[in-house]
C-alpha cells in the first residue's frame, strides 16, 4: 500500500545526491589566484591536441532566472519530543549486597500485551550509580551498583524505566516512573548477574554502534565484578568461535574494516583472550604480492596525438618514486584550503562519513611538523616560497603517517624567520622540545622533538629546497631522491605519461603512481600495517581500563596500580604482544615504541619487516587474491588537477584503469562508448546519461518491456543517445521532505494517509527526459502503452491534451472520474504530463514543470546532443538559490546526515563522562581526555563537544538526548559548519567519461575521467 511504502526514509536515501558536493569542495579555496592560461586537459576518447573539457561545447551557465511565484517554504516541526508517559510501576527490592560497593536488584511486573521493551533505567539521587535492565516476558529487573557504599540499607527506591515501543505507526520512547520498596535479602551472586546484564547492554544497544571502549568493558566487567572470575563459559566459547584476533586477513583491509576490527579486538582483550600468530620465521621475500604488471607507458606516450610539450613538475624530482605527491604553485592556495577545511570542509566530510570522532588531523600534523598558519604567512608566504610539494609514503593519515613538505624557497631570510616563529610557539606550548642533529648523505638534518613525540620536526636544506618532515626516515628518503640515490617520481614513466597526456599548468596537481600503490598493497606494508592495528588496540587498552574504573568507582583512577588492583587492567597489558613496554599515566595517552594511542609513530620509522609468521603470510595471500580479482592485470596511476579562478574551483581526476566489479563498470554498461554534450542549466538539478547503441542494458530493457507487455511496439527501440532525470528548484521539494522526514523534525503523530502522500509526491517538480531517434517508434510505443492501460484497468486512466506551450501539445495522463473508489481518490493528486519537444520526450508530474522544460528544450543550444568525440558520458549539475526550495532541501539533508552519527558520538561521550565525572564541567579536559583515550573527540552536528549526562542519558543542549530529543529550527546557527557550507555553495557540475588509452593491450585500456566544477560564494571574514 502507498502509505506503507519505504518513503518514510526517502530523504536519507537521496542524501548522497545532495551531499556529494560537500566532499568535492575539499579543494575549493575562497578567492584564489587566477590560473595560467595554458592549455587545459584533453577530454574524450583518444587524447587530442586541442584542450577541451567534457563540457567544452556547453554554453556558459545562463544567469539565474527570476524564480516563479511559489507558495512558502515548508516549516519543520520543531521543539522537544518527550517520551510518552506510562502508568507508574510499583515493585519490590528483592536482593542486595554490600561491600566495596552496594548492589540492589528491583523487580517489577508489567501488564502484558503492550509490546514495549525496557531498555534504560535511572534511580533518583544516584547519579554515580550504574544501572542495568533485564526484560524477561512480563518482568523487568533493574540492578544498581552504587560505587560508594551507604551506611544504611535502602528500603525504598524511586526512578524511571524507559521503554521502546510503538505509538500508532511511530516508534518512540515511553517513560514509566517507579517506586520499589521492601527489605531485600542478601545475594552473593548479585555482582555476577549485574556483570552479565551490563555486559550485554554495553555490546548490544539498539541506539547505534557502540564504541571500542564499550566492547572492552563488556568483556572486562566479568573479571572486575565477578570476584576476579572470568566471563561465563558460554561467553568465552562464543568469542573463541569468532577467532577475530587470529583472522589476520581482516586486518589486511586496514582502510575499510578498522573500526569493527578494533571493537572485536577490544572485546576479546576484555575477556582476556590473547590471540597468537606464531613464530616469525617466514622470510618476507617468499610472500608474493599481486601479480600485476606495469603499463607500457613509454610506448603509450608515443601513441599520443598531441604535439603540445608535456607539463613539468620540477618538485617531483625531490620526491621518492613510491611516495604520494601534491604540489601547489602558490602557498596561499594551500593556506586557503586549510582554512576552508577547518571551517567547514572537514566537518561536513566527517558528517558524510558518519564518523563519531573528529581527529583534528590538521592540528596534529602542524604540531608534529612545527608549522602553523599565521596571518603573515598568508599575506607574505608567496614572497618566501615560490611553490611547495607535500608528500608521504603511505595513506594511513588517521593512524599516524609521515608527512613531508618540500619548499622551493624564494627568500631564505623571510622563510627562516617564519619557521622559527612557528617552532617557538610550539616550544612554548609543548614542554621538553630539544634540538639535535644527524648527518645523512652530507646533509645536516636538524631535529626539534619532545619526549612524547608531539613535536618532531626534521628540517634540512639543499640549495633552494627546504625539507620539513615529521619523520627522520621520510626526510632521509626525500634527501636521497634529491641527490639521485633513490628513484625519483619525476623519472617515473606513469607520471611522465600523465603529464604528456594532458599538458598544461595547474594551480595544484596530485599524483599517486604505480610504485606507491604497489608498496601499499605489497606484503611488507600490509603486514606491517596489520601489526600497527594490533599495536593500536594494545595501546588503547590502558585508557579503556581507566575509563572502566571511573564507571565502576565514580572517579578517575590516580595510578595504574589502582587499575590493576581493581581488576580492570592486567599487568601484562602494559606491554605489547611483541614484548615492547607500554607507558601509561591515567589521563594521558599510552605510549610505546609504536607511538601513542592518539597518534602512532609513522610506519616508515618502524623497523623494516623481514620475517613474518605463517599466519601473516596466509592472511596476506588471501588479501592478495581478493585484490587481484578487482585489478585484473594492471595497477595504474591517479592524477588530480586543480584550477582556481574567482569563485570557481575545477577539479579534474583521471584514474587508470576501470576497476572490475565496481559501480564504474555498471555505469559503463549503460553508456558504452556513446558521448553527449550537455549545456549548462540555470535552475535545479539534473543528471544526464549517454546511452550506447549496442549496450547490454539497452538490449535487456527492450527485451523485458516487450516480453512484459506482450506487445512488440512497447519497446525502447525509439530511444536515442541520452536520458535525463532531474528536478527544478521549487519549494515543493521542501513540502515532500517535511512530510516524510523524521531525522530533523518531530515525527507526525500519525502517518499521513495515502491521498496526502500522493498529493505531496504529485507536486514534486521532478522530470525525466529522453532523446528520441524514431518519432514513429515513440508514437507506436505510446499508443501500445495506452491500449495496455485500458486493457488492464478499463476506464480508469485518461489521456488528454490539456494545453499547448510554445505551440507544443501537452498531454496529461491521469485517473479518470469513472475509476473505482479505491483509485479515484487520487484523481486530484497524481498525474503525469508529457510532451515531445526538440527531438526529446519529457515527462513531469506538474504542468508548470513541463512548461519550463519545453522552454529549455525548444532552444537547441540548451538541450543535450550526441557526440562521437568530446563531451562526456554522465553529467550531473545542480544550482541552488539561497533560501530557495533546493537550498532548504540541501540544508535539511545535510543536517539529517550529520545527525546519523550522533548515536555513536553519544556513546563515546558517555564513556568519557562516566569514566571521569570531573570533565562534565571542564570542556578542555573533556577534549583532552577524548584525544588521549580515543584519538579523537565526539562532537555534535554543530561541531561542539558540549555533551552532558542526565538520567535519560547523554545529551547536548541543542539536540537533547536519544530518549528525549529536541529539534531546533534550521540552520541552528550561522557559525556552524553546515551553515558555512550553505553560505558558500552556489552550483556544482560533475562529468564522467570513459576514455580510450593509446595501448595495444587486450582488452583495450580505458580510463575513468571525472571533472568537477564548483561555484562558491565569498568566504566569511
Regions found by a protein language model. Give the residues of each.
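Signature of soluble extracytoplasmic/periplasmic domains of secreted precursors
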Residues: 62-904, 910-920, 924-1021
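Bacterial signal peptide processing site
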Residues: 30-33
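Sec-dependent N-terminal signal peptides
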Residues: 20-24
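C-terminal motif of bacterial Sec signal peptides marking the signal peptidase cleavage site
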Residues: 26-28
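Bacterial N-terminal signal peptides that target proteins for export
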Residues: 2-19
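Low-complexity, Pro/Thr/Ser/Glu-rich flexible segments characteristic
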Residues: 35-66
